[in-house]
Each structure stands twice: as C-alpha cells, then as structure tokens.
C-alpha cells in the first residue's frame, strides 16, 4: 500500500504547524513508488486526473493511466510526462480515481477485488503533504464562494493560503505553493477520503443534488458528512445554525444575518459586503478563518478580517453581473444547477426577471423554485435538451429557443430575455440560472457561462440586434 515516508524530500512541513494532521493506517513512501515497487493507475483524466498526473510526475513517481474517452490534450500530456496507458483489467496496488467515476463503477469494483486501494486526489494530497493544514468546504450550494472567501480572509491575515479542489485549480496543483490549502469538496470527492482529518471543516448547507449518482438523499448527505468523519475534539466544524450533525469536532454555527467571530464580536454589517458576496458564505468563512488561525496559534485580528470582507470579490461564474443595458442587468450563474443555488439566485436578482432555464435535467426539486419565482419572474426562456420540460414543470409563462449549436442558442436566448423585459429601454434582470447541466450543448458550465457573457456583451455593443 501507499506509505507515508519520513524523508525530508517527502514530508515538506508547512511553516504553519509541526502537527501531523492526517492519521492514516498506511504509509506512503515516494522512493518506493519511484522504484517501481508500487503500481499506480490514474483512472480518469479530467481536470482532477491531470492534476494527479502532474503531481506524481513532479514527485518522480511513475504511473499508468486510463480514460475511456481521452482528449488529444490528455494524451499529449501523458506522453509528455512519460506515463503509459494502463489496463483497467490489470493489477494495481493503488488507483487514484477521478471524482466523476462512480464508486460502484465495474472497473473500480474489479480493481478493488484484485487488491487495489481506490483513493482520490484529496487523500493523495493529505498522505504526501501530511503537515499541510487543509480547510475543507462542502455543501449543496455556496461551497465554491465560501472556499475562495476563506482563502482570501486567511491571506488578509498574512497567511499564504490558496484554494483548490473541486474549484479550479486542482488541489494537487497548489499543495506546494501554500502554507494552507482551502479545499472545495464535492460529494463525489468525499466518497474517497478514508482517514482524512481536517482541523477545520465547513458545511454550507445540505439540500438535494446528484440523485442520479447517489440515488437517495440519505446517501448524498452521508457522502457530504464524510467531511467530519475523521475530525477529533480539538477540530472545528462550521455549520448553518440549526443543522444537526453528529461529530466529535467543536461546532461553530453561523447565521447569514450576522458577520461575527465565535465570541459574538461583529466584524461589519451585512449591508457593507461587496456586491455579489453572499452573506451566508461570508458568515461561514469568518468562523472558519478564525478557527484555523486559532488552531495554528496565530493571532486573530478583527480589523484585518473586516478589511478582507470589504475587499472580497465574487467568484467568476457565480451570480456575476456581466453586462448592463440601461436598467437591465445580465447575471451569469451558469453553475446554478442545484435547487438551493437557483433559489438563491432568484431571490437575489432584481425583478422582473427573464429566467434562462435549460440544459440536461438532473432531477432538481422544482417546488421551492416555483415559490421563489412567484411575483419575480416575468418569463422563462427555455433552451437546450430539457429546457421546455423544466419550464412546463415550473408552471410559469415561457418561450422556447430551439437549436443544437450552443453559442447560437445562447445568443437567441439572451436576446429573448432582453425582449421579455421590454428591450434596451426596459428594466430588470436577464438571469442565467439554468437548473440543468451544461453537457447537452457545452463542454462544461464555464463554457455555457462564457457563451452567455459573450451574447450579453454583444447586445450591449450592438453586435446582435436587440
């Protein structure tokens, strides 16, 4: 099995702590891996898998790879790193699987039966960098914004903190550049974190998502709660006030209407937050940053934390105003495919709203969205594979934009949204909070968001007739 060795080259201690934060019942020895006594397979070459490959190459560890549909970019990178294509039917000691590969995938089950240990990038990072403090963030909605904000607040306190994980960049791309890594953790990643102990963990909320993968809400929540499974009494778990969680860690409940430290001292009024910073994310981030500073023996300076909140900026592609025409605002929230995230977008957008809905339906709960849309949404603009189905289920006035070319469809949908609000002389919000995933028309949610942004800015510039 992978072993955690004791050489100075292997254990790069963070300047923040001499504590070994992760307790694993196995060891990782890079020299053993480099000596080819450890056979490793990287299963899946998405963003995470490529990060794993680059990391292992930097460590001098040879590995093989497998991907059912590798891109030309994937194959070029593997060739550059000197990694050979592996056989998923072969025998390996360790398989580092991409988050998108289900834990019950036939190949992974066969590899496990053959003696392989199946892990993910987070476990790999924790084993090879056991002295690097990791702050883990999960939740149904808000985890990306909270992750970025925690890292920002820690930097405001003078720490070299970087974010990674489910959010760009991959965690393994930042572990050697930071004193602290703040990690966004999806439910997929949290299925593969045996033995992970986080000094500080955050659960932003628990809703319903990814039932196509987890099958039940209970299984989805169980995966999320793995974030605290390895925590001990001196660790901290930040949760929304009222959320009941079984944990050995100290609970730090946050309330979105109050930006305060654990002792109740308020840092600044919620009204003073910059545009686009969600109060709940900010409240959770403050408590998480404070907890880590305390755990590391660093002073907590309220003035610097408050300054960090004031200087925070929203994450691109998360409820971002990308264009304006008069009193019409175009807001890009392409990542809003979870009920909680879409509901938050509908609540925050200035009405009347022209709501762009579409993509591939993944079974989101529409009941809360009907309530959030009442009196706020003027018209739904349906697009993509399941846009019309979603619009009909919402029971709101809608029109459908046909087509199979992503950019062309997005241009037409954005223009239709503007017209629904009365054209350039109207008022309100054209909101892309699509409910459906992007894979029907686009490579990913970022590509969909970028297409919407281009279309909106083209309308502003007069390049597309409104």
Curated annotation (Swiss-Prot):
Subcellular location(s) of the protein: Cytoplasm
Signal peptide residues on this chain, from the entry's feature table: none
InterPro entries the record matches: Mur-like_cat_sf, Mur_ligase_C_dom_sf, Mur_ligase_cen, MurD
Ubl conjugation among keywords: no
Protein name: UDP-N-acetylmuramoylalanine--D-glutamate ligase
GO cellular component: cytoplasm
Natural source organism: Deinococcus geothermalis (strain DSM 11300 / CIP 105573 / AG-3a)
Gene name of the encoded protein: murD
Function, as annotated: Cell wall formation. Catalyzes the addition of glutamate to the nucleotide precursor UDP-N-acetylmuramoyl-L-alanine (UMA).
Similarity comment: Belongs to the MurCDEF family.
Gene Ontology biological-process entries: cell division; cell wall organization; peptidoglycan biosynthetic process; regulation of cell shape
SS bond partners: none
EC class name: ligase
Residues where ATP binds: 139-145
Keyword line: ATP-binding, Cell cycle, Cell division, Cell shape, Cell wall biogenesis/degradation, Cytoplasm, Ligase, Nucleotide-binding, Peptidoglycan synthesis
Pathway(s) of this molecule: Cell wall biogenesis; peptidoglycan biosynthesis
Reactions it catalyzes: UDP-N-acetyl-alpha-D-muramoyl-L-alanine + D-glutamate + ATP = UDP-N-acetyl-alpha-D-muramoyl-L-alanyl-D-glutamate + ADP + phosphate + H(+)
